[in-house]
Amino acid sequence: LIRRTYKYAPLLLLLFVLTGCGTSPTSYPPLDPATAGFFTKYFIIPLSDLLDFFANSIGNSYGISILIVTIIIRLIVLPLTLKQYKSSKRMQEVQPEMAKIREKFKDNPQKQQEETMKLFQKHGVNPLAGCFPILIQMPILLALYQAIVRNPHIFSHQFLWMELGKPDPFYVLPVLAAATTFIQQKVMSAQNPMNKQMQSIMFIFPVMIFVMSMSFASALPLYWIYSNIFTIVQTYFLYGRSPKTKGGQAA
């Protein structure tokens, strides 16, 4: 079980990093390209400018601007997601052979691991494929958070009932962020038999998302909600219409 948590390590790391982020624009220096470091200059400022551009183009709505930027970010990582999908399909196809390896070498874990890796290489299965979309999104999500709290237009912007730079006073966004995270994990775990053994770990994420969303600027859980819905819809189109095996998994 522990060996299978590697896939979620990047997300856990990101959540812990974000936990240390402040919610006040005074916690950070202003966005000045002349004095900005590499990450600020090439990630935070362009993302802040992109949010400003879309907001100014659609009636000064930063809530909708975040939606557009979310879609752009998800489209950027879509090729990696498709690669992950293909690897996941291959993983499902080799499950019977993996079961035979586990049974044959049940008393020799090292040999079992060696034979499993040979099987992965033979069928082009990459067990790390699930990490890549998360790893790509990590710097973008960190940049998005700082773009929000360091951009005075976004920080003070009113969208629906909340100010995007402050926590949701009614906890609606934390609940929605946690709920969509739960649904996303549930939908994705149904596609991979290995994930079913990880449900107890995966269900921790919605709780973490809820707790952190209560203190984060509302724009970040709003991004999570948009991104989770995108993932749920994407998973349906990738897996939902696939033929099923006897075990109920996509073939």
Question: Which positions does each model-derived feature cover?
Answer:
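Helix-loop-helix
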Residues: 2-251
